From Swiss-Prot:
Changing L484A: Reduces nuclear export. It is found in: Cytoplasm; Nucleus. The modification N-acetylmethionine is found at M1. The lineage of its organism: Eukaryota, Metazoa, Chordata, Craniata, Vertebrata. GO terms for molecular function: protein-macromolecule adaptor activity; ribosomal large subunit binding; RNA binding. GO terms for cellular component: cytoplasm; membrane; nucleolus; nucleoplasm; nucleus. A motif (Nuclear export signal) lies at residues 480-489. Residues 425-503 are annotated as: Necessary for the nuclear export of the 60S ribosomal subunit. The keyword Nucleus applies. This is 60S ribosomal export protein NMD3.
């Protein structure tokens, strides 16, 4: 006799919903999902509309209690900021998922879709999906408020240089732009003999002072003034001032060193030419091609002044030029420049062509000069030199003429210049009419000195076509390989192409 095996598969039982009578699978609440949702709202207590503050000037969002952060639209950082606004109500439920719902970037609305779970009647777990609407409200942050107020600052750096030329400031401006040291400034003010940098915190100003000490030879003094105080909480409000003084020497200046300093630099001659000012003063002896670098501390220990300013440059024409092959070096002499060639030249002033008066001198420009060339230099023989070191020198050791640089046609150089530099956004007052000429001198220095160009970002000017390399004068030029493309990349919190989120 055989017995039929009973099937072990059993269909799950069904019960009726206690509210609507619909057959459902058994659950701890004995109620269907539709009726459970109609009776219990697990999102109760979570606000469906929240406000969030946004600064239009700096494109940042406010994160309580006092922080402003920059977030792109629909980014993880912005989602975290939105969830923190409803952190307390969300702590009572379990957050399963969160994500943005697309909105128009200019609608001043952010929508976040949330999926939450919570245990309800008799241990039943209910899941619900809903949207929280964030209203973006305009609010100016503290930093932008200080910028607009123009007088609310905590620290100021006053950079000064006692010279008649601004070549060092133009070079310093390019270094600040290259390394982004201007980003924390509230405003930059240009005055006749320097620049003023305003900051919202003393730490940012100290960082800028350290940068200046690394890039140009200078010294500084710090002071502070008490603005207000609270005797109950023992807090004080100060305004700090940093006075930075750059050495009063610029490129192409003729200087006279003290005998002690000249001896310490390798027994070089006291009359030297400044060929470059970077983190140190670079000098060259036009009689021997001996070079030396003087840092800021050495300069302030043994100060010296410029004998002539750029407005005293005179134009000479080269009558004869010969290269000195055998350079005699004294005992203990310093390093000799390999980029220059020592030459002996006879020159005559272009303003004295109707006379037969000529001047003889040695120059470090022997590799550039040929008979008939024009050259700029200082006439020391007919100049009143009011310098304590020159007055003590033997007159035979003071040259009649010191040649500085070869002269080219400035109009042609400007016309063929297919590059440009960026400038700091700053306030200007009491501008000198000579500033444009000084700026053109700085641009010419960049073309002539490769060592300075390495520290400067040079951008190609697309408005000026690239000409051929044929040059009848042989004036120095900047190659295309040394230029950068001028790109404008906007950091926009909306994620759109250059558009502001709020108008």
């Amino acid at each position: 006799m055989e017995y039929m095996a009973e099937s072990t598969d059993r269909s799950p039982g069904h019960i009726l919903c206690c509210e609507c009578g619909v057959p459902i699978s058994p659950n701890p609440a004995n109620i269907c999902v539709a009726c459970l949702r109609s009776k219990v709202d697990i999102s109760q207590g979570i606000p469906k509309q929240v406000s969030i503050s946004f600064c239009k000037q700096c494109q940042r969002y406010f994160q309580p209690p006092g922080t402003w952060i920059q977030c792109a639209l629909e980014s993880r950082e912005l989602l975290a900021l939105c969830l923190k606004k409803i952190k307390a109500p969300l702590s009572k439920v379990r957050l399963v998922d969160a994500g943005f719902v697309w909105t128009e970037p200019h609608s001043k609305r952010l929508k976040v879709k949330l999926t939450i779970q919570k245990e309800v009647m008799n241990g039943a777990i209910l899941q619900q999906v809903f949207v929280v609407d964030y209203v973006v409200q305009s609010q100016m942050c503290g930093d932008c408020h200080r910028v607009e107020a123009k007088d609310f600052w905590k620290a100021v750096i006053q950079v000064r240089q006692k010279t008649l030329h601004k070549k060092t400031f133009y070079y310093l401006e390019q270094l600040i732009l290259k390394y982004g040291m201007h980003q924390n400034t509230l405003r930059i003010k240009e005055i006749h003999d320097g620049l003023d940098f305003y900051y919202s915190s003393k730490q940012h100003a100290q960082k800028m002072v350290e940068f200046l000490q690394c890039t140009v030879p200078c010294r500084y003094k710090a002071s502070q003034r008490l603005i207000s105080q609270d005797i109950h909480s023992n807090t004080y409000n100060y305004k700090s001032t940093f006075s930075v003084e750059i050495v009063p020497i610029c490129k192409d200046n003729v200087v006279c060193l003290s005998p002690k300093l000249a001896q310490s630099l390798g027994n070089m001659n006291q009359i030297c030419v400044c060929i470059r000012v970077t983190s140190a003063i670079h000098l060259i002896d036009p009689n021997t091609l001996q070079v030396a670098d003087i840092d800021g501390s050495t300069f302030w220990s043994h100060p010296f002044n410029s004998l002539c300013h750029p407005k005293q440059l005179e134009e000479f024409i080269v009558m004869e030029c010969s290269i000195v092959q055998d350079i005699k070096r004294a005992a203990g002499a310093g390093m000799i420049s390999k980029k220059h060639t020592l030459g002996e030249v006879w020159v005559q002033k272009t303003s004295e062509m109707n006379t037969d008066k000529q001047y003889f001198c040695r120059t470090h420009l022997g590799h550039l000069l040929n008979p008939g060339d024009l050259v700029l230099g200082f006439d020391l023989a007919n100049c009143n030199l009011n310098d304590e070191h020159v007055n003590k020198m033997n007159s035979d050791r003071v040259p009649d003429v010191v040649l500085i640089k070869k002269s080219y046609d400035r109009t042609k150089r400007q016309r063929r210049r297919n590059w440009k530099l960026k400038e700091l956004a700053r306030e200007r007052e009491n501008m000198d009419t000579d500033d444009e000429r000084q700026y053109q001198d700085f641009l010419e220095d960049l073309e002539e000195d490769e060592a300075i160009r390495k520290n400067v970002n040079i951008y190609r000017d697309s408005a000026i076509p690239v000409e051929s390399d044929t040059d009848d004068e042989g004036a120095p030029r900047i190659s295309l390989a040394e230029m950068l493309e001028d790109l404008h990349i906007s950091q926009d919190a909306t994620g759109e192409e250059g558009a502001s989120m709020l108008t």
